[in-house]
Regions:
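Short alpha-helical DNA-recognition segment
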Residues: 16-34
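Alpha-helical residues within helix-turn-helix
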Residues: 10, 20-21, 49
Length: 62
């Protein structure tokens, strides 16, 4: 879970997005926050939407 959070934070920062910007139209800000901190695993649907917004392959998070 922590590795997923680290990778998500890396790709988000690489795109120059804040947590709130990434969460927009995808999920709650708190979901992004908890995932990046290794406290929560999001549903696959949300992970897919995050990857689409970041323009990265789904496998990049694992």
């Amino acid at each position: 879970m922590e590795e997923l959070g680290r990778r998500l934070a890396h790709f988000r920062k690489e795109k120059g997005l804040s947590m709130k910007e990434l969460a927009e139209n995808v999920c709650d800000y708190t979901t992004i926050f908890r995932v990046e901190k290794g406290k929560q695993l999001p549903r696959l649907e949300i992970l897919n939407d995050i990857c689409m917004k970041l323009e990265i392959p789904f496998q990049s998070l694992f």
